């Protein structure tokens, strides 16, 4: 919305006097065309002459200034690395929610197509078997919990499918697996009575997507 770029992978950086969009080689041609005529500069990732996002910020911001990010869009590791690199230039990272929510008035709603069960004869293994295998690996690594945000991994783990992404049978959701419980974060309207029963029978808790 803010750039006009329609590719599936990219990061926009908006400063008071300039803006940039970082994307990978899959979208160089597309982004060049879609950003044409805008005030947004395309930065082609992985090319030697392209500054990283933090390098760009350090070049154009003054010590003491802050960088705001949507915490939902970055992993903990990414945030920690960003904080470390920016702190070296006396820049601060502030983590907020979605910065566009108050200005994008006609934003399309989240997809709400219902989830459905993927038959075991196609899945090969039950979700109980898969969760057990995940917990075994967590124990080996001395890890208590695994938070899964990759939609294909969630679909595989739970043997659930959906229609939230064009040509990709996944469901917009999150999954938290600990040694003691499993919690599935999903919009309530996606959960049919059949899916709710399926999850409860497997001791999988259900929470709202934005909890």
Predicted regions and their residues:
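N-terminal accessory/capping or targeting/presequence segment of soluble
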Residues: 1-62, 66, 74, 78-211
């Amino acid at each position: 919305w803010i750039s006009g770029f329609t590719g599936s992978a990219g990061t926009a950086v908006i400063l008071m006097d300039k803006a940039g969009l970082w994307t990978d080689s899959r979208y160089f041609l597309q982004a060049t065309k879609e950003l044409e005529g805008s005030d947004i500069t395309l930065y082609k990732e992985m090319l030697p002459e392209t500054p990283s996002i933090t390098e760009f910020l350090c070049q154009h911001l003054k010590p003491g200034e802050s960088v705001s990010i949507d915490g939902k869009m970055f992993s903990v590791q990414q945030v920690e690395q960003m904080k470390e690199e920016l702190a070296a230039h006396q820049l601060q990272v502030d983590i907020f929610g979605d910065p566009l929510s108050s200005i994008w008035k006609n934003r399309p709603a989240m997809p709400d197509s219902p989830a459905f069960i993927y038959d075991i004869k196609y899945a090969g293994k039950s979700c109980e078997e898969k969760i057990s295998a995940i917990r075994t690996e967590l124990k080996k690594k001395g890890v208590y919990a695994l938070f899964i945000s990759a939609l294909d991994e969630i679909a595989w783990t739970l043997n659930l499918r959906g229609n939230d992404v064009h040509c990709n049978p996944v469901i917009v959701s999150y999954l938290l697996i600990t040694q003691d419980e499993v919690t599935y974060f999903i919009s309530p309207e996606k959960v049919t009575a059949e899916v709710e029963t399926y999850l409860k029978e497997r001791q999988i808790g259900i929470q709202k997507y934005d909890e």
